[in-house]
Amino acid sequence: MSMSDPIADMLTRIRNGQQAQKASVTMPSSKVKVAIAKVLQDEGYIEGFSVREGEGKAVLDVALKYYAGRPVIERIERVSRPGLRVYKGTDDLPRVMNGLGVAIVSTPKGVMTDRAARASHVGGEVICLVA
């Protein structure tokens, strides 16, 4: 059976892995998942990620990050989902925790944070919120 929301599955694996104090989590890879992982790494929410070939399919390994024994990601939640897509213009992009967190947005210029989207004057689909 195929997965209906692979991005929500990715976010859930990261959330569950951090609650279980895992060093890393693995999941099936895709271009969008790699782009989201790159944004999370650039913002300092994960240690890093790598894509490797496993059993004929690409696998994404995400190295989780902790500070003083606690997960760096306090909250990660899906906003736009297959049943209800959420699109926002430049001026309507959400601010997470008044700028302390990030919203990950899929724009015509690629996947980026809400701050980068505002600076580029582009809107798009709000994928998730991370704090």
UniProtKB/Swiss-Prot annotation:
It comes from Azoarcus sp. (strain BH72). This is Small ribosomal subunit protein uS8. GO terms for biological process: translation. Belongs to the universal ribosomal protein uS8 family. The gene is rpsH. Signal peptide: none annotated. PROSITE patterns: RIBOSOMAL_S8. One of its GO terms (molecular function) is structural constituent of ribosome. Part of the 30S ribosomal subunit. Contacts proteins S5 and S12. One of the primary rRNA binding proteins, it binds directly to 16S rRNA central domain where it helps coordinate assembly of the platform of the 30S subunit. Gene3D superfamilies: 3.30.1370.30, 3.30.1490.10. Keywords: Ribonucleoprotein, Ribosomal protein, RNA-binding, rRNA-binding. GO terms for cellular component: ribonucleoprotein complex; ribosome.
